[in-house]
From Swiss-Prot:
It is found in: Cytoplasm. The keyword Transport does not apply. Residues 1-326 are annotated as: A. InterPro entries: HATPase_C_sf, Heat_shock_protein_90_CS, HSP90_C, Hsp90_fam, Hsp90_N, Ribosomal_Su5_D2-typ_SF. Molecular chaperone. Has ATPase activity. Residues 546-681 are annotated as: C. Residues 327-545 are annotated as: B. PROSITE patterns: HSP90 (PS00298). Homodimer. SUPFAM superfamilies: ATPase domain of HSP90 chaperone/DNA topoisomerase II/histidine kinase, Ribosomal protein S5 domain 2-like. NCBIfam families: PRK05218.1 (NF003555). It comes from Bacteroides thetaiotaomicron (strain ATCC 29148 / DSM 2079 / JCM 5827 / CCUG 10774 / NCTC 10582 / VPI-5482 / E50). Belongs to the heat shock protein 90 family. This is Chaperone protein HtpG.
Length: 681
């Protein structure tokens, strides 16, 4: 028996492994099974070139549970005593301290970086044995034993067959890895597509009402997964079946892209376009990254462009440096090339479907839209390609490319300054009356109700020359696309004040909502009262909900305009009745206000060119008294209008109709509206 110390050029390796990899204990199984696969494939290679002339036989790798042990057995090339010394005892770990300091926050980077895959066994084992026999003729079987200290023993043993058995004596605090269900879960996660058969236990079958173990090996992996095969060999059903295998609970994918490139890097895989139903963030990280069919991670940021992390599927590449920090990944030239390649393949595939089967593309647009919009918002080179097949959808559910839509609306929706106005709605039902008003004028209205459409509107305004997007409820229809300068026909000062004050006094109090009441001549066929909201302020508040750094707008109240149509007979009727009812009280107040106003103006004119200190104190005092008097009279007059309005059911009814039309009438206010409507009927 030989004894010795493991050669580590700095500090003991085992505390390092325990300290930095405690959160990733489970990857020991991935590493050990991967090593067994490598040993098996190397034997296959030697046989193919004539260096191994023996019988290959069954090359299945076995994972077996004992009372306190896990054993991974292969019939690969095995190890000689010299190879044990070279690859196990003398660990090339120069610069370990520097490495650990650099990657102390990226624990998974350590495993595999310096050939430490085998030593991951010590994360879960208090003792490890290797019983191995080389494929070479006359090789002596060797048993290597280590208890987690730098000391080891090597002794000759009897072993009939070539290959290696790695026996782990599991630590007391890692007993979960002796549970069949837990090991099965890890093998399924990491080893489902390894290229050599992996057996874990025996298959079971139902017999006499219970499960009975058979003599047949339970093979847990598919050695030739779909992405390793030629696309020409595969049917649509093959792709769909593989998708169901990867994502059992998901709907059928929209379509897929088979990746296969050998130069200047190696990359295979299949990417699926799923149906994204809800929150974007919840749908990320569904792409599985493999290295030579060994599962590595589903966090593919930095390898796949951000917008494509919404896709599902598999990417397999030996050229992605898996065991380094994410910051290094992002600067690696191969990773950048792979990212660019994937983006190009996706855009080419979308362009191909659009060109060859536009009907299918339009049918799937609602599901594709989030991928394409996300890509255009976040990646300029994708935008350049996608602008040729990205679609607008109007409220009649017709689809147009950007160029087609521009041609459609340019004659009728260009304003007096030459700006092309894109009208849109984000809720077809709630904004129906505004959409109808626009379409009655011959305008086309887009439906932009997607998760990313707020951001898309802002981006497209910057991309499109002399263009502006305006929501149909942001103003009255005649102001959405102003085609010529025109005089704003509205009520005279006193009449406007009377009716706007009356309506304003009856507006309900709403949390963080403010109204500005105005009058406008909209024609006798338009609604008597409308609610609009400034495009700019609404858009800023919407952006504040999805973009950091704009919380100021999010805290501001919602500002709405209550527009009274002075041409409508009901508004005229309210105004006439208000004037008749209020005139006796208001007239003397207005006369007094006119007198106060005249004197205020005289004083202000006389003080116009004087310095503050040159104005007599008496004049200052008089002006202050006049201001107070003015406010007092104004409040008194407004009180009269408000008093009249409080007893006028038509005013309250018109306000509630406008609120109801905008989905702003709820609770007690809605109940009162219903009661009042019944009374009026």
């Amino acid at each position: 028996m030989q004894k010795g110390n493991i050669g580590v050029t700095t500090e003991n390796i085992f505390p390092i492994i325990k300290k930095f990899l405690y959160s990733d204990h489970e990857i020991f199984l991935r590493e050990l099974v991967s090593n067994a696969v490598d040993a098996t494939q190397k034997l296959n290679t030697l046989a193919s070139i004539g260096e191994f002339k023996g019988e290959l036989g069954d090359l299945t790798i076995h994972v077996e549970l004992g009372k306190d042990t896990i054993t991974i057995s292969d019939r690969g090339i095995g190890l000689t005593a010299e190879e044990i010394e070279k690859y196990i005892n003398q660990i090339a770990f120069s610069g370990a301290n520097d490495f650990l300091e650099k990657y102390k926050d990226d624990a998974n980077a350590i495993i595999g970086h310096f050939g430490l895959g085998f030593y991951s066994a010590f994360m879960v084992a208090k003792k490890v044995e290797i019983i191995t026999k080389s494929y070479r003729d006359e090789a002596q079987a060797i048993k290597w034993t280590c208890d987690g200290s730098p000391e080891f023993t090597i002794e000759e043993v009897d072993k009939a067959d070539r290959g290696s058995d790695i026996i782990l004596y599991i630590d007391d605090d890692c007993k979960e890895f002796l549970e069949e269900a837990r090991v099965s879960e890890l093998l399924k996660k990491y080893c489902s597509f390894l290229p050599v058969p992996i057996a874990f236990g025996k298959k079971k079958e139902w017999k006499d009402g219970k499960q009975i173990e058979t003599t047949e090996d339970n093979i847990i992996n598919d050695t030739t997964p779909l992405w390793t095969r030629k696309p020409s060999e595969l049917s649509d059903e093959d792709y769909k079946s593989f998708y169901t295998k990867l994502y059992p609970m998901s709907d059928e994918p929209l379509f897929w892209i088979h990746l296969n490139v050998d130069y200047p890097f190696h990359l295979t895989g299949i990417l699926y376009f799923p149906k994204v139903k809800s929150n974007i963030e919840l749908n990320k990280n569904k792409i599985q990254l493999y290295c030579n069919q060994v599962y590595v991670t589903d966090s593919v940021e930095g390898i796949v462009p951000d917008f494509l992390t919404l896709l599902h599927g598999v990417i397999d590449s030996p050229d992605i440096p898996l065991n380094v920090s994410r910051s290094y990944l992002q600067s690696d030239s191969n990773v950048k090339k792979i990212s660019t390649y994937i983006t190009k393949k996706v855009s080419d595939r979308l362009q191909s479907i659009f060109k060859n089967d536009r009907k299918q593309f339009e049918e799937k647009w609602n599901d594709l839209k989030i991928f394409i919009n996300y890509g255009m918002l976040t990646q300029e080179d994708f935008y350049e390609k996608a602008q040729k097949f990205a679609l607008f959808t109007d409220t009649d559910n017709k689809h147009y490319t950007f160029e087609e839509y521009q041609t459609l609306i340019k004659d009728n929706q260009t304003d007096k300054d030459g700006n092309l106005i894109y009208l849109y709605a984000n809720n077809k039902d709630e904004q129906f009356s505004y959409i109808e008003a626009a379409t009655n004028k011959g305008y086309n209205v887009l439906l932009m109700d997607g998760q990313l459409d707020v951001a898309m509107v802002s981006m497209l305004e910057q991309k499109f020359e002399k263009s502006r997007f305006t929501r149909v409820d942001s103003d009255v229809i005649d102001n959405l696309i102003i085609k010529e300068d025109k005089k704003n026909e509205t009520l005279e000062g006193e009449k406007q004040e009377a009716i706007t004050t009356a309506f304003k006094s009856q507006l309900p109090k709403m949390d963080k909502v403010e109204f500005n009441v105005m009058t406008q001549a909209l024609g006798d066929n338009s609604a008597p009262v409308m609610i609009t909201q400034s495009e700019y302020m609404r858009r800023m508040k919407e952006m504040a909900n999805i973009q950091a750094g704009m919380s100021f707008y999010g805290e501001m109240p919602d500002m709405f305009n209550l527009v009274l149509n002075s041409d409508h007979k009901l508004i005229k009727q309210v105004l006439d009745e208000e004037e008749a009812a209020c005139h006796p009280e208001v007239a003397p107040i207005q006369t007094e206000m006119n007198s106060v106003s005249k004197r205020r103006n005289e004083l202000k004119d006389s003080q116009k060119d004087k310095k503050e200190e040159d104005i007599p104190t008496a004049e200052k005092d008089e002006l202050n008294e006049l201001d107070k008097k003015w406010d007092e009279l104004k409040n008194k007059k407004e009180g009269i209008f408000a008093g009249y309005a409080s007893n006028n059911k038509v005013i309250r009814q018109l306000i509630d109709l406008a609120l109801l039309q905008n989905n702003m009438l709820k609770g007690e206010a809605l109940n009162n509206f219903v009661k009042r409507s019944i009374e009026l009927i």
